[in-house]
Every structure is written in structure tokens, then in C-alpha cells.
């Protein structure tokens, strides 16, 4: 399942497409078009949050849940942002962190109903990526004045700095749950 995005122009998109292993199919669209969003969960139970609503740095706090058929707006993030990272395996429990405008360190926990501010990242940054669950996660990369290789792990209560990436990058993709996972791509 993929959703949102940005096309030259610039314009943000609300399209959602699902993949069945062979082909992509257009399904019900997001309620609000955005890019720079974060999301987690399988095809049947996903959540996404934040984003940029106009491709010009207009941070959003909106969240939407996917039930396998359609999106529904749900409780907003406490802090509007885009280019944020996160972790989670379904729409009932997730974690989001970092983001822009001006790099943010905020971390918020999703309990299936609302977002709660919890312990901040040690280093605030945008274009951060992560993987894991809401109680055991990894946050990495990001771009301050230059791409960063910072890595922090979350134990359900606080963040701890750990070994950096070999090469600092931003806008990475990621997958996995701790103790193993991977990050890839990025300029």
C-alpha cells in the first residue's frame, strides 16, 4: 500500500494504490493530500501522520487510519510536522519522531486512539527514518545542514545514541523490527 506524494509542479497527491504481488491498483484516496508523511502497518490496518499539505513547507498534524478499504481521519499529532520518521506494525500501536519545520526532536506514541508526547530524540532532525515497534525502535539519518548518520534506539521509555551509519544520508527508506532491519537509498 502506498499513499500521498509529490509530483513536479509542485503539487501534493492524495492517491492510494495497493499491490497484489503483480500489479498496482488504485483504491480509495486519502482525505487530505500530503507528501513527507510517515506511516506504518499492513494492508488491513495502517496509520499515517503529519505531512506537507501544499509542497511549500506547510506542516500538518493530521492523522488518518486505513481499515483495508478506506481512510478515516483520526486524532491529530500534538506537533505538526513533515519529513518525520516512525515505527510500528499496525494502526493500534505506533511511534513517530523527528521532522521539520526546523528540525524537531519530539517523539509521540500512538495507542490506537490518541497521540501522546513521550521522551524526545537526543538530536532533533528532519528527513529521519526508522523501523521497529512502539516499544523497541531505531531512528537514523536526517538532514541538518548536511546529511547525518546519527542512530538512536528506543526502549519504550527513552532514546539512546548508538553507533552511527557509515555514511550520513537523508531521506532513506527502511524496514524491519529490532534486533534486525535495514535502511537504504538516500542522496
Residue spans for each PLM region:
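Polar, enzyme-active/binding microenvironments
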Residues: 1-187
Amino acid at each position: 500500500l502506498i499513499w500521498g506524494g509529490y509530483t513536479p509542479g509542485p503539487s501534493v497527491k492524495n492517491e492510494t494504490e495497493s499491490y497484489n504481488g503483480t500489479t498496482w491498483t488504485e483504491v480509495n484516496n486519502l482525505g487530505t493530500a500530503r507528501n513527507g508523511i510517515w506511516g506504518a502497518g499492513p494492508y488491513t490496518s495502517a496509520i499515517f501522520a503529519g505531512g506537507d499539505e501544499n509542497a511549500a513547507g506547510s506542516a500538518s498534524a493530521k492523522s488518518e487510519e486505513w481499515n483495508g478499504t478506506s481512510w478515516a481521519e483520526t486524532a491529530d499529532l500534538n506537533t505538526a510536522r513533515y519529513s518525520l520518521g516512525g515505527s510500528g506494525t499496525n494502526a493500534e500501536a505506533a511511534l513517530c519522531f523527528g521532522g521539520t519545520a526546523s528540525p524537531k526532536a519530539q517523539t509521540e506514541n500512538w495507542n490506537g486512539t490518541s497521540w501522546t508526547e513521550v521522551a524526545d530524540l537526543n538530536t532533533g532532525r528532519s528527513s529521519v527514518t526508522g523501523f521497529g515497534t512502539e516499544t523497541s525502535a531505531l531512528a537514523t539519518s536526517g538532514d541538518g545542514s548536511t546529511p547525518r548518520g546519527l542512530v538512536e534506539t528506543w526502549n519504550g521509555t527513552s532514546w539512546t545514541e548508538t553507533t552511527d551509519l557509515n555514511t550520513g544520508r537523508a531521506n532513506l527508506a527502511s524496514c524491519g523490527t529490532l534486533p534486525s532491519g535495514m535502511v537504504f537509498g538516500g542522496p
